[in-house]
Amino acid sequence: MKKLLFVLISCSLLLPGCSKKDDTTKALNALYEGYYEAVSSSEYFITQSDYYTLSGEIVAVQDGTYRYSIILDNPQIAMYDVVMMGVENNIEYSEAKKMMPSIGLLSDKYSLIPFQSNSEKNYVKGLVISGDSKEASVQLKLLVEWSNRLRDKQYREFFDITLDENGISFNSNLESNE
């Protein structure tokens, strides 16, 4: 009887932990979906930023697929809590069969400060997101988001890019980047 009572008490103590984990997972899924929808629904894209450099490449992998990478580096201003997310080939959230590449969203927070790095504090020289594709060319809608030092202002820039064997090309529907 004492063993049964001990097991019941132990189980009742573990159940709230499971509920908290489920709540955390739901919150992270909602955050991911919100960013996914923001990227997918953006209608205004720029071709370059005044605040950092974007570059990219796509390479063939031995199994016949392709791996692509988008690199953000060379910050011109202090950028805190940077988030990057790409959505491949205009795939709707409900149709996505894989996680889209992102950094700073569901993982650690990263900051970029010109001419400084401190990996212990997550101050980095650059960020990379990468993904896999069955095709030699991939079209990405990309969001780059960051905050100022006080974290009281947030900035977002959207890009529509194509990666292929020739490198990265930027598509824009704006006449200027202002």
Predicted segment positions?
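Positively charged n-region of N-terminal signal peptides that target proteins for export
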Residues: 1-4
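Extended basic-aromatic, gly/pro-enriched interface segments that bind polyanionic ligands
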Residues: 7
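N-terminal export/targeting and maturation segments
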Residues: 19-104, 109-111, 116-121
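A structural detector for beta-sheet-dominated domains
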Residues: 69-73, 83-85, 143-145, 162-164, ...
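Short beta-strand elements
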Residues: 153-178
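Short, solvent-exposed, Trp/other aromatic-anchored flexible loops in extracytoplasmic proteins
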Residues: 99-155
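C-terminal motif of bacterial Sec signal peptides marking the signal peptidase cleavage site
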Residues: 14-17
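Hydrophobic residues positioned within well-ordered beta-strands of beta-sheet architectures
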Residues: 54, 66-68, 140-142, 157-159
